[in-house]
């Protein structure tokens, strides 16, 4: 059981049972490392940074299965180690997509652009992004080893982030107009 990896042998003994009760700190580590990092941010970055492959690994930290991978060598080597020695079935996996973090960067530019122009709208979009993403993680409290990937639960969050990608286009046009390289229509 994945949850036992986070408890280890350090949990508190439950009287009359062989089970260990996790401490509050162990629960927090599980929440941040597994539920937020592995079950939310990994899916988020698959869509906006890139995906290593489509092989499911229920174990967080498996460097060859199901991670996000952007295609920028330095970043990928720091996170996952040298992948050049990986077997061909991993290198040539059809689920492998490298977006070089461009959608992520465009979305962040759109976020800052909206914040500078319309703080109220930005906060609304951020709250919807949060409520359909991280708040769903809190609400669902998914246990490890699900029957299938549950990334569809976070689709709303990805839509709201995509709105910021669209706003980046507006930021780019605004910048070009100010620099007099483009005449506004």
Give the residues covered by each predicted segment.
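Lumenal/periplasmic acceptor-binding loop at the mouth of the active site in multi-pass
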Residues: 1-111
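Membrane-interface catalytic loops of GT-C/OST-like multi-pass glycosylation enzymes that act
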Residues: 93-96, 118-121, 138-155
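Membrane-interfacial loop-to-transmembrane alpha-helix junctions, especially the N-terminal start
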Residues: 99, 117-129, 182-184
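Transmembrane alpha-helical segments
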Residues: 104-111, 161-173
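Hydrophobic alpha-helical transmembrane segments of polytopic
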Residues: 106, 125-132, 160
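Signature aromatic-anchored transmembrane alpha helix within multi-pass, membrane-resident enzymes
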Residues: 115, 119, 167-185
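Aromatic-anchored segments of alpha-helical transmembrane domains
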Residues: 129-138, 185
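Hydrophobic/aromatic-rich transmembrane helices and adjacent perimembrane loops
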Residues: 146-170
């Amino acid at each position: 059981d994945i949850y036992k990896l986070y408890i280890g042998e350090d949990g508190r003994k439950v009287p009359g049972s062989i089970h260990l009760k996790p401490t509050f700190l162990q629960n927090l580590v599980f929440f941040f490392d597994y539920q937020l990092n592995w079950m939310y941010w990994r899916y988020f970055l698959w869509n906006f940074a890139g995906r290593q492959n489509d092989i499911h690994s229920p174990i967080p930290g498996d460097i060859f299965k199901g991670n996000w991978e952007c295609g920028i060598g330095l970043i990928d080597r720091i996170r996952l180690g040298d992948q050049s020695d990986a077997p061909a079935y991993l290198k040539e996996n059809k689920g492998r997509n490298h977006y070089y973090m461009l959608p992520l960067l465009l979305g962040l530019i759109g976020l800052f652009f909206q914040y500078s122009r319309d703080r109220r709208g930005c906060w609304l979009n951020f709250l919807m992004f949060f409520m359909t993403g991280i708040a769903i993680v809190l609400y669902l409290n998914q246990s490890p080893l699900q029957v299938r990937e549950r990334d569809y639960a976070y689709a709303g969050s990805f839509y709201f982030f995509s709105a910021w990608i669209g706003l980046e286009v507006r930021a780019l046009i605004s910048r070009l107009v100010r620099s007099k390289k483009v005449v506004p229509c």
